[in-house]
Amino acid sequence: MKKYKVVGIGNAVVDVISQSSDTFLQRMGIEKGIMQLIEKERAEALYDAMENRVQAAGGAVANTLAGLGALGLETAFVGRVRDDALGQFYAQAMQEGGTDFVNPPVQDAHLPTSRSMIFTSADGERSMNTYLGISAELGPEDVSSSVAKEAEYVFLEGYLFDKDKGKQAFVELSRACRSAGGKAGIAISDPFCVERHRADFLNLIEHELDYVIGNDAEIKSLFETDDLETALAKTAEICELVVCTRGGEGVSVIAKGARVDVPVDEITPVDA
């Protein structure tokens, strides 16, 4: 019996959330409704300008682990934070949420903990300004083989592919998990990330992973086609389990050649 159902690896980002007006966004030069990557000085200026801010541990894979933990599953997260106020907050929040944060905050690091300043407008639109900070340095030295071998599944975040050290960390975690009988997979995260690293993505999926999760745009991007069915078939040829989310069309799952299409129920949002 392994200790963890799922071990994830990804960007450890503190979400800093504040209500804001369109006037404020214009004054601060924030483009409404999109996510932008920003530098340290810009991050500090926006953080200081936020009023009544609320903080939460975030990051794509970390959020998934939080959901799994809420279902009662044992989870752990491989991430990198600095030993600063936000880093200590992040590590504590993950632990209190039921997910083991296996990497202690890094002392004397030259980059601060990653944060995403999220400005929520009255119409519900979110404007995100993300500074990656120390998360961009996550590498194989942060991967504990003993933790990986205690995982039934490891879950990788595609966003880390923009750094060579992130790719190396992926392979390290995947191989350690699979060598102990576990399974490894990835959430592709972003079609533009695939565009930048297509060959590496395909090599990882075919040779190092047991499952892949992506939306229709991400799956199509893997094989540079506008035909989703063609992309799904080709992905299924190199990976035994493919999960494709298709928005209002539902979810398509292909497991060892057998396909199931799961429909969605249409509802009216509570704030519509």
Locate each region found by the language model.
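Hydrophobic beta-strand scaffold residues
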Residues: 75, 101, 184-185, 242
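Glycine-centered short loops/turns at secondary-structure junctions
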Residues: 72, 98, 179-181
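Conserved phosphate-binding/catalytic region of the ribokinase-like
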Residues: 1-7, 12, 26-32, 37, ...
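Conserved phosphate-binding/catalytic loop of the ribokinase/pfkB sugar-kinase fold
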Residues: 102-107, 118-164
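Cofactor-binding loop segments of dinucleotide-utilizing enzymes, especially the Rossmann-like FAD-
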Residues: 9-11, 80-83, 120-122, 131, ...
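Conserved beta-alpha-beta core of the PfkB/ribokinase-like small-molecule kinase fold
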Residues: 153-233, 249-251
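A glycine-rich helix N-cap at a beta->alpha junction
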Residues: 93-110
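Glycine-rich phosphate/adenosyl-contacting loop at the front of the ribokinase-like
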Residues: 1-78, 88-89, 263, 268-270
